[in-house]
């Protein structure tokens, strides 16, 4: 993987712990951190060609797929949580995770001059 140490260092600087996994010859990266309320969270991406640009693109894809309210509902169903404040905290946690993943992807994208950072902005979600 291109600049593997740089990718891991940048991830750590953004609060993510990263591990690599090989399944049937395909490289995957697991990103882990605790949410702002202390709940463990992780997501996994395929490393593709291993370049910072490819990894950034996969993270941007994850970020664009995350819908905080939907994730909070799923978490409440799985955990058995019932309080409205728990739902609001779960939504806030997912918004924070999405933001932190997006910031990580921006910095990784900046490592790759061929990657257009403007393509990563979710224009349809901006007010």
Task: Label every model-predicted segment.
Residues 1-35, 96, 104, 111-125:
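Negatively charged, low-complexity tracts enriched in Asp/Glu with abundant Ser/Thr
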Residues 23, 29-32, 48, 60, ...:
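Intrinsically disordered, low-complexity regions of eukaryotic proteins
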Residues 36-90:
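Intrinsically disordered, low-complexity regulatory segments enriched in Ser/Thr/Pro
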Residues 43, 80, 99, 124-127:
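Residue-level signal for functionally critical sites in structured catalytic/ligand-binding pockets
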Residues 6, 10, 58, 71-75, ...:
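Charge-rich, solvent-exposed alpha-helical interaction surfaces
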